[in-house]
Amino acid sequence: MPPRRGIEVRQAVGDGAAPRWRMSLLENTFSSFLQSIGGGVAADGAAARAVFGEGSLFSPFLFGKFFDPADAFPLWEFEPEVLLAALRRGARTTVDWAETDSEYYLRADIPGGRKCDVEVSGDDAMRVVDVSGLWRAAPPPPPPDGRDWRAGRWWEHGFVRRVELPEDADWRKVEAFFDDGEGLLEIKVPKSGDAHQAAAATA
């Protein structure tokens, strides 16, 4: 089994705001894709079907509501029990998160994922973690005009999700790990020093 490895967490440069994905997606785009998912997508579509069809954090239909991947998902507004209950209805717990006095912890199953990248960005208004990756099947050759996969039918190549962090998260110190064998992503987000000290004082 491939070892669990650390992922270099890139920090966005410039004004601190990560760029939005270039292609705004519509629900009917995914509806037609899901109807024809039986072939051509990562091992006869099993990986994409597992992610898109079972309430994964990376599903465009998370909790029955369409999420454009350009929109940051406020994961921390959900109680863990509520989040997991929705996923258990699909008979697969694909995401978990927890909070301690010192950090936030996110763990997500990404079936069929073979590569995972994490980028963090932030400013005074919002702190966002961008998670993206590729399916195990080799992606098709890039288009001749040089556009990257985020500009086209990205769901045939991989997955993406933007996760909004809470205000007390120290976004500059995010750590990420990925298990290539199990497709398990782990992200640790330490709390800021002031938040940590306040929690310790009230303990």
UniProtKB/Swiss-Prot annotation:
It comes from the Eukaryota. One of its GO terms (biological process) is response to heat. It is found in: Cytoplasm. One of its GO terms (cellular component) is cytoplasm. Pfam families: HSP20. The keyword Cell membrane does not apply. Keywords: Cytoplasm, Stress response. InterPro entries: A-crystallin/Hsp20_dom, HSP20-like_chaperone. Residues 86-203 form the sHSP domain. May form oligomeric structures. Belongs to the small heat shock protein (HSP20) family. This is 22.3 kDa class VI heat shock protein. It comes from Oryza sativa subsp. japonica (Rice).
